[in-house]
Structure formats: C-alpha cells, structure tokens
Amino acid sequence: MDTEKIPRRFEFARDSFAFANELVWEYLPDAVTGKTMMVARDPKPEYAHRCFALVRVARQFFYHARFAADQPEASGEACRRLMRAVMARSVRIRCQPHERIVIPGFPGLREFSRTHEKLIKAECGGAWRSYFLRSHWRMIFPFSRAHQTRTAEALITALGRNHLPILHLVKFPALSINHAIILFGVTDTRQGWEFESYDPNNSVASERLMFDRGTRAFILPANACWPGGQLDVSHICRSCFF
C-alpha cells in the first residue's frame, strides 16, 4: 500500500534515466567565423532522436510509479510488464497515491534504468515517437513575446503544484533546435526566472533554462546540442491539443 501523504519532488539523481539520448551531430565552434559547425558523429549513435520519448516516459514514471527498494527485485519479464503498465497511463494526469504501480527492488528510475537499460530503451519506442506528436502543430506559428511571458508564468504555476512541465524547444523556421526537456524547479532572479531542467541528452547533471523579463524571452545556455542563446518554448503534454 502506498502511504505517501506529501507528494515527493522530482530529484535528478533518482528520477532521471541513467542513460542519455545520443546526439547524431557534434556541435563545434568555428574559430574563424564564430559560428557553430555541425559534424556527424563517428561512429553513428545507436540510440538517438528519443528526447521526446524519454521525457514522456520519465514523467509517466514520476506520475504513476512507486519504487520499493526494500522488496525483492522482479524478473526481467516482470519488469517489462511493469514498464508497459506505467507507459499505458496518462502522461498528462497524475494518478492517486494508492493507484501507483509498484516497481520492486529499486530506489528510483535511475537505478531501474541502469539495470534494465536494454529493456527500457526497447519499450520506450523508436525515433518516430519524437516526430509524430499532436503538439508539433504549434511550432509553425509565431511565438510572440506576450505568449512567452504567459508561458513562463504558467510554468511557475505548474511547478508550484508539483507538476513536471514538458517543453518543446524550437527556433522555427530555423531547424537549429527541435528538442524536449522537463522542468522540475525554478528560482526567481534579478533578471527573471531560472528553471532547473532534466535534459535527456545529459544523464550526468541537470541543466538550466532562463526567462528574461526585460526581453520577454527564454534563453538556453550552450550545451551539447545548442550554441546558446534565445529560443522559443512550447509547453506540451498538458491538454488534448498539446
């Protein structure tokens, strides 16, 4: 029986995957032009284009699973059934504590995915899950500064309710970024807000996303797949339209 009375907060070291979504391209700065060059990775990655799939499943585990490290670990086939049961749940609505699916033998998703990496990668699905999403229609329309301000405010409200907002990061019509992350914390700063995020491309540490109240824009610092700078944010997996 789940005796959870106070909803626990997302913890990167416990609630993220032990493996990363691999990058197809390596992003390198050009010393002459200052621009970022894209160089194909060699050897070709075996597990890429799964960012949307990974953030979706990470949230499903946070919303619908309870890990029980004090119980005997389930067999591989039993773990597969548990994995599928979690993935069959809503990605948008959290279940009641007593309805959570118990995952025995592990303290959290990180250790579960470390032990059953191959199984979990297979069950999360192929790269197509990152391309065929109902929310992708939004990226072709302009993102106004007022819209981005409202989005930032809505994200703060969601985090205050212990939700895990999933964001689609875009720079449309440029194709320089098409990525998904999860937010799990926010800090008020002099310039605006600094959000703490789980980026499925990074299994080592959490990352940051800033919102500048002056420019009314989101700013993502440079990382393995982005040279740094302003981009647009769409809050997805939150309604029947997203």
Annotated model-derived regions:
Residues M1, A174-N178, T187-F242:
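Cys-His-centered catalytic/binding microenvironment captured across papain-like cysteine peptidases
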Residues T3, T33-T36, T115, T149-T151, ...:
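Residue-identity detector for threonine
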Residues I6, I93, I101-I103, I120, ...:
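Weak global preference for isoleucine
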Residues I6-R145:
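Cysteine-nucleophile protease catalytic domains, especially the papain-like/related folds used
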Residues C79-M87, A180, R208, A222:
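Short alpha-helical interface elements
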Residues F143-R190:
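Active-site-adjacent substructure of cysteine-protease-like catalytic cores
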